[in-house]
């Protein structure tokens, strides 16, 4: 018994009983739970490039300032990128996170150790996690050599990067509401989330947004890519390509097919990709100018979230 505002003793057991019943109702009623939650509060950014770790580019600039802007607007964020060999670890104060490292990822019947590093952008109060591996990310370039030729193993590098992000997020025990993918290196994330990780508690309610940039690669992925990317939960029937080289257009369409929303991140977009996007039946955000894109993207997260919970 406790005194109420008038000093009268009341039986509080009934109050606590009501609270427990209400919480159990929320837990078991998905629709009510989502109304109660109202909006997506946690956003995971998977980025092909981020400045200042790499030179400025359309993707690198967006992925530097968008997470900061979204965080300043009240959402919780995590950000990942590959640890390319041309990133200066000492200057940028990267250090390995031992508790997150050590897993082996098998790609094409070969074990590849997963190494996780982290650094902070102090001005943004933002941490960036890096996916590293000696086989894939030690060369002193990003996705092309000094002559502008795409690396032959870019297909495996993209598989390793995306799977590395998924496994690390699981170890962090952090459940994202939205995953926002930037660049073709991240294009497998929608497929993996919707198929290979569909029943995982970290990702089963996650909605995926793919930002389509005009950053085509010049050498198609080999025909063996469709076999290398397979995981439990993914069938060859899920792919729009099998047993043939995969170009930028096909890879982008695969990402769009398994996404919950698409953003046109570059001012121009390949006509076939634009048409495919508009016919996909999911929310689509046209190109936004540099002055407005952070607010527009931030609002789009809730559009995608609410559309998926109608």
Could you describe each region identified by the protein language model?
Residues 25, 36-310:
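Catalytic cores of nucleotide-sugar-dependent glycosyltransferases that transfer UDP/GDP/TDP-activated
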Residues 4, 10, 31-34:
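Acidic, Ala/Val/Gly-enriched low-complexity intrinsically disordered segments
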Residues 2-8, 100, 107:
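Intrinsically disordered, low-complexity segments enriched in small/polar residues
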Residues 2, 23-26:
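Short hydrophobic targeting helices and cationic amphipathic motifs
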């Amino acid at each position: 018994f406790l005194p109420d505002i008038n000093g009268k003793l009341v039986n509080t057991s009934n109050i606590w009983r009501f609270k427990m019943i209400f919480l159990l109702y929320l837990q078991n009623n998905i629709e009510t739970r989502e109304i109660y939650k109202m909006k997506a509060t946690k956003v995971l950014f998977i980025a092909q490039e981020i400045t200042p770790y790499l030179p400025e580019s359309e993707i690198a600039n967006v992925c530097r300032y968008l997470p900061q802007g979204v965080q300043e607007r009240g959402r919780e964020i995590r950000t990942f990128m590959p640890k390319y060999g041309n990133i200066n670890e000492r200057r940028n104060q990267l250090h390995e996170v031992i508790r997150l490292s050590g897993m082996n990822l098998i790609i094409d019947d070969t074990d590849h150790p997963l190494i996780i590093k982290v650094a902070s952008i102090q001005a943004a109060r933002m941490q960036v996690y890096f996916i590293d591996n000696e086989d894939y990310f030690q060369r002193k370039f990003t996705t092309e050599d000094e002559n502008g030729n795409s690396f032959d193993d870019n297909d495996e590098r993209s598989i390793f990067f995306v799977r590395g992000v998924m496994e690390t997020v699981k170890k962090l025990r952090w459940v994202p509401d939205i995953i926002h993918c930037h660049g073709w290196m991240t294009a497998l994330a929608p497929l993996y989330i919707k198929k290979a990780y569909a029943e995982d508690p970290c990702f089963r309610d996650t909605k995926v947004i793919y930002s389509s940039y005009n950053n085509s690669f010049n050498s198609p992925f080999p025909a063996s890519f469709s076999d290398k990317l397979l995981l439990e939960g993914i069938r060859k029937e899920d792919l729009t390509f099998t047993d043939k080289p995969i170009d930028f257009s096909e890879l982008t369409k695969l990402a769009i097919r398994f996404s919950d929303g698409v953003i046109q991140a570059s001012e121009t977009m390949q006509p076939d990709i634009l048409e495919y996007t508009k016919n996909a039946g999911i929310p689509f955000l046209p190109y936004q100018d540099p002055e407005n894109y952070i607010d527009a993207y931030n609002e789009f997260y809730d559009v995608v979230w609410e559309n998926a919970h109608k």
